[in-house]
Regions:
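Pan-zinc metallopeptidase signature
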Residues: 211, 217-294
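Hydrophobic, aromatic-lined core segments that form the binding pocket/scaffold
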Residues: 130-133, 158
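Post-HExxH zinc-binding segment in Zn-dependent metallohydrolases
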Residues: 2-24, 28, 170-213, 286-291
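Short pre-active-site segment immediately N-terminal to the catalytic Zn-binding motif
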Residues: 134-150, 177
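N-terminal low-structure segments adjacent to metalloprotease catalytic domains
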Residues: 1-67, 74, 78-80
Length: 294
């Protein structure tokens, strides 16, 4: 079994924010980079590159995020404290249930909105980047929500490790069908690790029942966007929604994985070739979109 490691940048963020909290958002943005994030060059580079690839100016994004830092500071602090309390036990559960044999670095930081959880590599090792600003925004600072989030991201890392793909895997997720498969796989792993269906990303108690009732419609809408080469980001991520419901793509992907589990092991599902993922994913969506649910 590998080991969990922690890189906690919260003390550095707190020192930066003590100096920057009363300044203009433009100054806060500059100081975030120079006083805080430049101490972690790879972490900085990953965030900036994410927005560059989408043709966005990270400073403009930061201007929308930084004004909430003061009001969300207590939730960010609680999230950081809870992560420290639980990350080792969640890693142990994941190692036992998924038979993991690699180290994971958990990076706790305050960034520019690149996600509450981000499964990737850091210093050439498997890593989970935990963005406190997004965690606080989603109100995922409780231990229950964080256990789900961390388990979900470990699921992504297990998937990458079994496929022996890291950067290539993140690039493959740009295809909407592969993203559906990837997020569904991670969501299934979350439930396996925690021993029950936790759905940490459900925004309220009605979310799951709505998704089940609208499963056919969700599949049809996802297919329509693929066919018209439209973005599917409304199905994923905390800033987007479908008919007012966020994160519905995770449910749709989870159902895809559950269907595949009827004839395959989890590892066999993890190792499906990209072309086969797309073929099976489209078959699943087409079949589902022609069904009606009460």
């Amino acid at each position: 079994m590998g080991k969990p490691k922690l890189l906690d940048t919260w003390p550095e963020f707190s020192r930066y924010w003590n100096q920057a909290c009363s300044k203009s958002v433009e100054e806060q943005t500059t100081l975030w980079r120079t006083l805080y994030m430049e101490k972690y060059p790879e972490l900085l580079s990953k965030q900036l590159q994410t927005y560059e690839e989408d043709g966005l100016d990270w400073k403009e994004i930061a201007k929308k995020i930084f004004p909430s830092f003061s009001s969300r500071f207590p939730q960010m602090q609680k999230a950081r404290d809870n992560i420290i309390r639980i990350y080792k036990s969640i890693y142990s559960k994941a190692a036992e249930t998924l038979k993991l044999h690699f180290n994971i670095t958990f990076v706790v930081y305050v960034g520019i909105g690149c996600g509450a959880g981000w499964a990737t590599t850091y210093k050439e090792q498997p890593a989970i980047l935990l963005g406190l600003e997004n965690i606080a925004e989603e109100k995922w600072h409780t231990q229950q929500k964080l256990k789900g989030l961390i388990s979900h991201e470990i699921g992504h890392l297990a998937h990458m490790a079994w496929r022996e793909e890291w950067q290539m895997f993140e690039q493959a997720e740009k295809d909407p069908v592969f993203q559906l498969y990837s997020e569904g796989f991670a969501q299934r792993c979350e439930h396996i690790i925690l021993g029950k269906e936790t759905w940490h990303l459900a925004e309220n108690k009605k979310w799951l029942s709505w998704c089940k009732q609208h499963k056919s419609w969700l599949a049809k809408e996802f297919l329509r966007r693929i066919e018209k080469q439209m973005m599917v980001k409304d199905f994923f991520g905390s800033w987007f929604n479908i008919q007012g419901r966020k994160q519905t793509g995770y449910f749709l992907g989870h159902e895809f994985i559950r269907m595949l589990e009827e004839t395959r092991s989890l590892r066999e599902i993890a190792l499906l070739k990209v072309d086969n993922v797309r073929k099976l994913g489209l078959q699943y969506l087409n079949a589902l979109s022609n069904k009606t649910f009460e």
